[in-house]
Swiss-Prot record:
One Pfam family cited in the UniProt record for this chain: Guanylate_kin
Name the UniProt record assigns to this protein: Guanylate kinase
Entry EC no(s): 2.7.4.8
Keywords noted in UniProt: ATP-binding, Cytoplasm, Kinase, Nucleotide-binding, Transferase
Family: Belongs to the guanylate kinase family.
Catalysed reaction, written as an equation: GMP + ATP = GDP + ADP
Organism listed in the record: Aromatoleum aromaticum (strain DSM 19018 / LMG 30748 / EbN1)
GO MF annotations, alphabetized: ATP binding; guanylate kinase activity
Function: Essential for recycling GMP and indirectly, cGMP.
Domain named Guanylate kinase-like: residues: 3-181
Amino acid sequence: MPGTLIIITAPSGAGKTTLVSGLLERDPQVNLSVSYTTREPRPGERDGREYHFVDVATFRALRDRGEFLEWAEVHGNYYATSKVWLKQQIATGRDILLEIDWQGAQQVRKSFPDAVGVFILPPSLEELEARLRGRGTDSDDVIMRRLLGARGEMRHVGEFDYVILNNDLQCALDDLVAVVRASRLRYANQHERHLQYFDFLEQD
């Protein structure tokens, strides 16, 4: 039985990384897809865990060989998803969580139309700016660029199946866990899990 692909998208600073970490702790059936990126690692990040950190030349070589399912440039850095790895994981029944931007989500859904799309919103742009400044890792120019990008990203919220407003971290995490559980109860998934039972029910 194939697994479920869950796409998580959010503007930088909306709390996506924290929510994803919480989901992985609460639901051991979910596995995180590790994307490729050319950005510098943040404090505490490790190559192969949060991302595969590569230089631009390596990224372009992988892209040109057709290794990526999708790729995008965000805030001057490249991000991409491994095509072969993702298809193998889904085929073997694993639920995979993919953290990508809205552009990447559009590309992925061409290959995985049944993927579940979740968009995480900050409570306001003012709160988003406060969170970005609270990180203490970005310059004012980078923060302003991220805020401008966030407004553009949030215009695509209507392209997603579920929207979570991250005003309270625990409530937002509960919502995300509920979305993942609900995705497993869709007809197509339940039919695959209980094929004989459903075939019996659908007999004339």
